[in-house]
């Protein structure tokens, strides 16, 4: 699993903090709940919020810079220090990302 496995939520959290906030909140809650019919003890990654969180605040998704890996024909990875650099996110800070989203949803709904 990647780092987005740490950016999870549950149906009770979505129902309490997302669903009450207008039509968009209802829609997002519906989509979240439709993903699995058994909600007891269930949580789900909200992977698409990770990319947005990084764009909004790089501190919410710290990175390391490494040379771009090379995918070989045998589906293994090789490295070459001369390749262009890429950033790898090594941690997702779930709480500030979700708090920011919920606050923005509340503000939008209260306009």
Task: List where the protein language model places each region.
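N-terminal acidic, glycine/proline-rich low-complexity segments
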Residues: 1-111
């Amino acid at each position: 699993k990647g780092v987005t496995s740490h950016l999870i939520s549950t149906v009770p959290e979505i129902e309490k903090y997302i669903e009450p906030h207008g039509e968009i909140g209802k829609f997002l809650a519906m989509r979240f709940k439709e993903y699995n019919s058994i909600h007891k003890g269930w949580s789900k990654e909200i992977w698409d919020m990770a990319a947005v969180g990084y764009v909004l605040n790089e501190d919410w998704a710290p990175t390391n810079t490494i040379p771009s890996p090379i995918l070989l024909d045998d589906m293994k990875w090789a490295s070459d220090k001369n390749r262009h650099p890429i950033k790898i996110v090594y941690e997702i800070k779930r709480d500030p990302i979700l708090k920011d989203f919920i606050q923005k949803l509340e503000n939008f709904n209260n306009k």
